[in-house]
Amino acid sequence: MLLSAQGCAPASSAAEGGGTHGLTISDARAAYDSYLQASNAAAAQGNQVQGLALAADAQWAVLHAQYTALASEGTPVPQYKYGTPIFYVPALAGYPQWFMVATTRTPITAAGAATRTIMAFERSAAGQPWTLNGTAALNQALPAIATDRDGYAVAVSRSDPGLLLPPDVVGASQAGVVDEGPTNPSAAVIASGPLTTGLYAAQSAQSSSDTAHGWYYQWLLEGSPFEQFGLRTTDGGALVLYGMYLNTTTEHPGLVRGSPIPVPASFTPLLAAPTEVGYHAVYANWTFQYAAIDPPASAKNAKIQVIAGGGGPSYGHAY
């Protein structure tokens, strides 16, 4: 069944799968098709109520900011054209139900190339609508997913002891490297890459640039309360999806009043009032969805690889 419709099981905060297929691939495909139609229609119409009703967790935070930018500056909410989907459907009997889709996504409303994207959908309870909880652009191929005899995948719990790290601390370990770089102890288990040491380098460069202006720059990648999902891989590891916040501050030392600190352009529409000026500080916070490969504990010299990321600005403030 590993064709254009592929079965899989979740590793969110819900328990591991018990082998019952309460959600079929046909159900997932119908929910996915409905989402594509409704989300693009809401974006085209600028219908914030309808658009946000289709999202949750990291996706809601990013989408809320996009609709805020539409209202404040007329910036169109992104619309996309999607390629052929591959479905990963959980084998859980109860709720929450969820599934993942791997596909290509090309912007319609702005220039941009197609990106290979993984999307996580969830229905929290019977009678509740399906929501898109997060999207992440892949920077390498997805790992092979282990499946049962019916083609459905094996769920991975948040505390699985058979992995290099329990899935619920993968995000915190990534954050250690992003916040402090390769000298952080987490670098022993987190591989270098654009979403780990690369993000640290980018933030460090921003800090150096701000220091040259006489400002003090701080950043912190931290965990979120968002649902976490995971799939067993064929080598005994796991593919883990999770959400994170990246909070940044640029301030005059001691928060004394000084010359205005510029607000990043992508955050200007998110200010509560256009009169906000960074005489003291500017806060620019992001919300991200990540996907990582967590190798089996038995793998020698293995490290966790963060293979996908996506998100955007979610909060801005200046005073």
Describe the predicted segments one by one.
Residues 1-103, 111, 115:
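An N-terminus-focused feature that recognizes amino-terminal "leader" regions
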Residues 19-70, 144-214:
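Core segments of small alpha/beta cavity-forming domains
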Residues 56, 126, 245:
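Residue-level marker of positions within ordered structural domains that often coincide
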Residues 69-115, 215-261:
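Surface-exposed, charged secondary-structure patches
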Residues 76-78, 157, 264-269:
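Glycine-rich loops and low-complexity Gly/Arg-rich segments
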Residues 108-164, 233-241, 266, 276-319:
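Short beta-strand edge/turn micro-motifs at domain boundaries
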Residues 254-282:
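Mixed-charge, low-complexity intrinsically disordered segments
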